[in-house]
Amino acid sequence: MNPLAQLIIYTTVITGTLITMLSSHWFLAWAGLEMNMLAFIPTLIKKTNARSTEAATKYFLAQSTASMILMMAIISNNLLSGHWTTTTNYTNQFPPLAMTIALTMKLGMAPFHFWVPEVTQGTPLTSGLLLLTWQKLAPISIMYQIHPSINTHILLILSTLSIAVGSWGGLNQTQLRKILGYSSITHTGWMMMTLTYNPTITTLYLITYITLTTTMFLTLNLNSSTTTLTLSNTWNKSTHLMPLMTSTLLSLGGLPPLTGFLPKWVTIQELTMNNNFIIPTIMITMTLLNLYFYMRLIYTISLTLLPTSNNTKMTWQFENTKPTLFIPALITISTLLLPISPLILSIP
């Protein structure tokens, strides 16, 4: 891709997200979402092939459908209340319900999740990273603004369904991008679980999730790993990354005493304080499934070499020219922040 075109595209993606996050007017928020969506599509088809074109088409159809529902909700709210502000008190339950459906569709939450694994699988690792991290910021910022009017029961149902679908869907997958796509569905469910109770916990979970996912994608990009077969050659390509990738995967699964355990612990604590006991039990059970397929990846990295017909053509250690500047810092943050969790939680 032309560097100038790439600069314009990424600038528009960032600008669209910032317009949505900083806007209190519904039309500007919607326009920011559209700018972000239309500018992001070219990043999905950097490599022109049938799979990337299919992924971009699925992304466009899902996002445009959600945008239409959101615009319908915005117009309905204006007709009913006469206001265009995002923080208005909603007198009718229909606009916030339609907004919730539209924004959860944009986030890829169940039952509107079908596009997430397919789009993630059909894109390069860098585009998949942006899809599962940066592209969540704008919809979540809108949900943050309207959270007092969101129906708590509906959001809890959608979040629980997302956790279950993401955990079950990740089983028996061999494509790493699909596994991370299903993992994203699960983590989005965890994020949204406490939005109506305590949005600060949602923010904490979002920051932790973005850090862990960025670390994982950058590590996979460094090794050029997209399947469990290529992942099994990690010990040959980057021996020093084996324990670091292992700890990142365990943190992504929420295993103590790693960083990923902190937001899960706080989320469960918040739900139990609000007398929700069945939902945290389901969440913990589903997290065990998540941890299972992360452990399967760890087993692949550290202990085995998958059956292949060309074992003699191994990829040996060559000098890696890809930038590794941020990976050590990100891995440190991804694994070692739990001891300072009281300090993190004390920040208002």
Swiss-Prot record:
It is an enzyme of class 7 (translocase). InterPro entries: Complex_I_Subunit_2 (IPR050175), NADH_DH_su2_C (IPR010933), NADH_UbQ_OxRdtase_chain2 (IPR003917), ND/Mrp_TM (IPR001750). GO terms for cellular component: mitochondrial inner membrane. Keywords: Electron transport, Membrane, Mitochondrion, Mitochondrion inner membrane, NAD, Respiratory chain, Translocase, Transmembrane, Transmembrane helix, Transport, Ubiquinone. Pfam families: NADH_dehy_S2_C (PF06444), Proton_antipo_M (PF00361). The keyword Electron transport applies. It catalyses: a ubiquinone + NADH + 5 H(+)(in) = a ubiquinol + NAD(+) + 4 H(+)(out). It comes from the Eukaryota. The chain crosses the membrane at residues 13-33, 60-80, 96-116, 124-144, 150-170, 200-220, 241-261, 278-298, 325-345. Its EC number is 7.1.1.2. It is a multi-pass membrane protein. This is NADH-ubiquinone oxidoreductase chain 2. The gene is MT-ND2.
